[in-house]
Regions:
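Single conserved hydrophobic/aromatic residue that forms the stacking wall/gate
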Residues: 1-7, 11
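Transmembrane alpha-helix signature in integral membrane proteins
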Residues: 16, 166-195
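Membrane-interfacial helix termini and adjacent extracytoplasmic/periplasmic loops
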Residues: 33-36, 148-166, 224-258, 327-328
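Flexible loop/hinge segments at secondary-structure junctions
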Residues: 39-152
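Cytoplasmic-entry segments and transmembrane alpha-helices of multi-pass inner-membrane transporters
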Residues: 189-228, 266
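Transmembrane alpha-helices
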Residues: 266, 275, 289-325
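Interhelical loop and adjacent transmembrane-helix boundary motif
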Residues: 324-357
Length: 357
């Protein structure tokens, strides 16, 4: 009966939590849909190629590779066997003098047309206002950003030109890595301490530990981050012989430490609310102390324990500054927990825009 009642409370809490999370996700997606209305190429600019070039469209990743000179031949893009020649507006002075361009670049449209027409392998990134109606080349299609480019993209570089990279996969992967290991560290240790304080420790020990643990929950996250930076990061670098200690493991440990006070406090309070009569009845039936804890106290307290775990882990997963300080802030897809990474909350904090002065 106790187990059924406890499980019923858990299912109710899980249902309410799931609905809340679903509503948050729907709201965030509604706000983020504006991203998919944006074009791949930076607003106000176009990509122009020679008229003889058969290439009509490039993805954001291909554009980045071209301008980073990782792709150097049009053959790799389905075009002719010709070298890719990148042209930006600032390069125009290498082709024409200031007199030929005009004092205010009024002759720049004609000059850009001549450059594109005279170079078979050129790809020009220029403002759209410099493209005339009788432009001798052709413009690459500028499609809207697709879902695949966002959720399956492997690069996050929103300030890249000419095509910003909005690959969300590194951030999702980094968040999952850090969250999973934080839960793995915090959950068993937190529940063990809660059981000790509730069922094993004497009054004097409990009265000392409880305020100390509650005090830890009030420490600012930046202090935890600084502690991780000067203690945990060098320790990980030394133990695992790594080039840098700012890794996902450091972030997981810091987040686990931050989650522990909430998990311990709420779980311990839930266990202490178990009626004394239930404990004594279990012992009277011949159960040992540990059997009573496992079979009676924990099942009765499972709803409170679940709340403590959700609150503690929720705070850890949503943490920004502490994670930003110890994980290396690298927007790459990690293959192990011993590599630098970046989480979604840390990215939000790191890339907030500045208000105009």
């Amino acid at each position: 009966l106790v187990r059924s009642r406890g499980l019923g409370d858990v299912y109710k809490r899980q249902f309410v939590t799931s609905i809340t999370i679903l509503l948050i996700v729907v709201f965030l997606f509604a706000e983020a849909l504006g991203l998919f209305n944006k074009k791949v190429i930076e607003e106000g600019y176009v990509l122009a190629v020679n008229k003889a070039n058969p290439v009509q469209e490039l993805s954001a990743a291909q554009i980045k590779d071209v301008f980073d000179e990782e792709i150097t031949n049009w053959k790799e893009l389905g075009g002719p066997d010709a070298e890719v020649k990148v042209f930006r507006l600032e390069d125009i002075t290498s082709y024409f003098s200031e007199e030929e361009l005009g004092a205010e670049y009024e002759k720049a449209p004609r000059c850009i047309g001549e450059i594109v027409a005279g170079n078979p392998g050129i790809i020009a990134f220029v403002p759209s206002k410099f493209i005339e109606k009788d432009f001798p080349g052709h413009l690459l299609k500028d499609e809207s950003i697709s879902f695949d480019e966002v959720f399956a993209g492997k690069e996050w570089f929103p300030t890249a030109t000419p095509a910003p990279q909005f690959g969300f996969l590194p951030l999702i992967t980094g968040t999952l890595w850090v969250s999973f290991f934080a839960i793995l560290f915090a959950l068993p240790f937190g529940l063990s301490v809660a059981v000790y304080m509730s069922e094993v420790a004497d009054h004097r020990t409990r009265s000392f530990l409880k305020p100390v643990i509650e005090l830890l929950s009030g420490i600012p996250s930046v202090v935890y981050g600084f502690f991780g930076l000067i203690v945990i990061v060098p320790l990980i670098q030394k133990v695992f012989n790594l080039p840098v200690g700012e890794t996902g493991l450091a972030g997981s440990i810091v987040l686990a430490i931050m989650a522990l006070p909430t998990i311990i406090t709420v779980s311990e309070d839930a266990m202490r609310n178990c009626p004394r009569a239930m404990r004594e009845a279990s012992l009277a039936l011949g159960a040992t102390r540990w059997q009573t804890i496992y079979k009676v106290v924990i099942p009765f307290s499972v709803s409170g324990i679940t709340s403590g775990v959700v609150l503690g882990i929720g705070r850890a997963i949503g943490e920004t500054m502490a994670v930003l300080m110890v994980t290396g802030n690298a927007a790459v897809i990690p293959t192990t927990i011993l590599e630098p990474l970046r989480t979604i909350p840390a990215t939000i904090a790191a890339e907030l825009g500045e208000a105009p002065a």
